[in-house]
Amino acid sequence: MFIFTKEVALKPEICREVINQFEKSPHKNPGFISDSEGRILNDASKIKKSTDISLHPEQLSDPIWGDLLRTIVDTVYFGLRDYKIRYGQALYNLPDLEICQLINIQRYLPNEGFYEYHAENISDNNKERVLVWMIYLNDVTDGGETEFLFQRIFERPTEGKLVIWPADWTHFHRGIPSPTQTKYIITGWLSFKK
C-alpha cells in the first residue's frame, strides 16, 4: 500500500504554535489548484476550498517561521527515513529525496475540503514529485479524513500525525470535509535531489 503513518510525529505544542502563527499571519490566501499546464484555475471552489499559506524551504531564517520550519523539515526527514525502513527492499534503489517546491499550511473550515480525487504528480509542472507528506495539526473527530481511493483507506486527522505516500496515480486521494470542525494541515512533496 505504501501509505506510511506515524502518530505524534510533530509535538502537540509545535502543532498549536503553527496554527497560532497561521491565524495571526497577514499572508493567508484562498487555496488554489492549477491545471495540467500549471495555470491557476480562477474558480476552483467546487474542487477545493481552503485558506492557505505557502512557505519556501529557503525561509528557514524567517523570524516567525524559521524555527517552526526547521522542526517540520526535520520531522519529515525522520519520517522519510522510517518510510524507507518500513518498505525496505521495495525502495532499495530509491535515490535521495529532498523537500521540493512549497510547504503549504492549510485551514479547512467546516464543509471545506479537497473534494475531488487527485494525484500529486500527473502534470508537467509537478512530475518531479515522488512522495507526498502531510502532517495533521489538530484532531478532527467528525469527518475530515483523507480518503485513498484504490486502497480504501480513510486516514483520520489526529494532532501531529505524519502521513507519507506515493505522489502517483496509484494513490488518488481527497480530503473529506468535516461538517462541524475546522481542520489544519501542513503538506508538501519530496522529489529527487537535483
What are these regions (language model features)?
Residues 1-162, 170-194:
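Fe(II)/2-oxoglutarate oxygenase catalytic core
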